[in-house]
Amino acid sequence: MNQQTVNVIGAGLAGSEAAWQLAKRGIQVKLYEMRPVRQTAAHHTDKFAELVCSNSLRSNTLANAVGVLKEEMRALDSAIIQSADKCSVPAGGALAVDRHEFAQSVTDLVKNHPNVTVLTEEVTEIPEGPTVIATGPLTSESLSQQLKELTGEEYLYFYDAAAPIVEKDSLDMEKVYLKSRYDKGEAAYLNCPMTEEEFDRFYEALTTAETVPLKEFEKEIFFEGCMPIEVMAKRGKKTMLFGPMKPVGLEDPKTGKRPYAVVQLRQDDAAGTLYNIVGFQTHLKWGDQKEVLKLIPGLENVDIVRYGVMHRNTFINSPSLLNPTYQFKQRNDLFFAGQMTGVEGYVESAASGLVAGINAAKLVLGQDLVTFPQETAIGSMAHYITTTNQKNFQPMNANFGLLKELPVKIKNKKERNEEYAKRAIETIQTISKTI
C-alpha cells in the first residue's frame, strides 16, 4: 500500500469514480464532500453521485458512442457503471437507474473502501499535494474564486435544467400508451399523443408562461443537450416537433397512426411509481409549470413530485489549462475531472474521473501517466476538451465524430459506427491489461 495520500474534492460522479480508481490501486484517499453541511442549488441529499437532472445514463448499445463509453468503463472496473448496472430500471435501449438506489450504491462502494477517508466539509482553498478537483458545475463561491486565481482565466458558464418528475398513479392511462421509439428494445416509455390543436394550445401556454427571473449579471448560455423546454419552444414550433416532442416511430397502437406530437415519460424509480418527462427541463415558475403540464393529454390531473428547476453550471477553459491526462498544465500534481472540464453528461463526467483517478495514482506511484488513444471514446473526449478551439470552447457529449477516423472509409453509417465500436473496445481491453 502506498502511504502518500491523494485529495479528491467532490463526491459527485467524477469525484467518486476518481476516488475508487485511486483506492483500488492501493492509494490512500481523502475524499472531501461539503454536502450536507452545505448544499448546492440543485442537490437534495448527502449521497455520493446524486443525479440532479435525468435518471438516464443514455444509450446502453454499442450503436451509440455513449454506449461504447460505458463498455470501456466496464473494462476498467468503473464504480459508477457497476452501480448503474446494478440499479437499472426498464428504459428500452438506454441505461436508466433508480436514482436513490444508484446514489446509495456508489456511496457504499466508495465510502466502505478501506483506503478512502471521507471528510464532510467545504474546501475553500486548493490543498497542496496530489489533488483531484471534481467539484462540478456548482462549485462553491469560495473555491470558485480560488480556481479563478489559479487558472488566471474567467470561467465560462451556462445553465442546464431538470425535468419535472410525476406520479404514475395520477396519469390517465386511457390516453397514454406504452411504447419505445421504433419498438426498439422493450416498451419502456409512456407516450402522450397530441393532435395539432392540442399541440398549438400547449405551445401557446408554454411560450407565454412565466420563468424564474435570472440575475442581471448572468448571461444565458444553454448547452443544447439540456436546454429548457420553454427556451426551445421560443425557437419555433418545429424545434419541438423535431426535438423532444418528435412523433416519428411512436404510432398510437389504438389508431395505428402517427400523432402530430408526442410527450414521452420515462420510469424514474425501481418501483415504477415515478416518471420524468423526457426533454422537459424547465425553469418555469412552479404554478405555471403545473398549468402547462396539465395541457398534455393524460396529465390533466398530474401530481408533480419534483418540479423542474434550473441551475448555473460552471466549467473551465480546458483547452488552455489541461493535458489529455486531465492534469493541470501549470501544476503537475493537480488534476481536474467532471463537468467542470467541459465534458457534458453523467457518463462522460464519470469517465473523466476515471482517467484523472488512474493518472493521479500513476503520478504517486512514480509511473508514466496514461493518455488514452483517440481510438477510444474515453480518449477522444479527453483529446477534444484539451485540443479544441480555446476561444469558442463549449461542453461536448461523447459521439463517434470525436473518435480517430477509421483507416478505411465506410459509407454506411451503421456499419461505420459498428467498426468504431469494435476498434474502441478492442483497444481498451488491451490497455486495461497494463493499467
Swiss-Prot record:
Cell location: Cytoplasm
Chief location of this protein within or outside the cell: cytoplasm
EC number in record: 2.1.1.74
EC class of the enzyme, as a word: transferase
A GO cellular-component term linked to this record: cytosol
Keywords: Cytoplasm, FAD, Flavoprotein, Methyltransferase, NAD, NADP, Transferase, tRNA processing
Xref: Gene3D superfamilies: FAD/NAD(P)-binding domain
The keyword NADP is assigned to this record: yes
GO biological process: tRNA methylation; tRNA wobble uridine modification
Listed cofactors: FAD
Reaction(s) this enzyme catalyzes, per UniProt: uridine(54) in tRNA + (6R)-5,10-methylene-5,6,7,8-tetrahydrofolate + NADH + H(+) = 5-methyluridine(54) in tRNA + (6S)-5,6,7,8-tetrahydrofolate + NAD(+); uridine(54) in tRNA + (6R)-5,10-methylene-5,6,7,8-tetrahydrofolate + NADPH + H(+) = 5-methyluridine(54) in tRNA + (6S)-5,6,7,8-tetrahydrofolate + NADP(+)
Record GO terms (molecular function): flavin adenine dinucleotide binding; tRNA (uracil(54)-C5)-methyltransferase activity, 5,10-methylenetetrahydrofolate-dependent
Residues binding FAD: G10, A11, G12, L13, A14, G15
Keyword field contains Ribonucleoprotein: no
UniProt family annotation: Belongs to the MnmG family. TrmFO subfamily.
Function: Catalyzes the folate-dependent formation of 5-methyl-uridine at position 54 (M-5-U54) in all tRNAs.
Protein name per UniProt: Methylenetetrahydrofolate--tRNA-(uracil-5-)-methyltransferase TrmFO
Organism: Bacillus velezensis (strain DSM 23117 / BGSC 10A6 / LMG 26770 / FZB42) (Bacillus amyloliquefaciens subsp. plantarum)
Gene that encodes it: trmFO
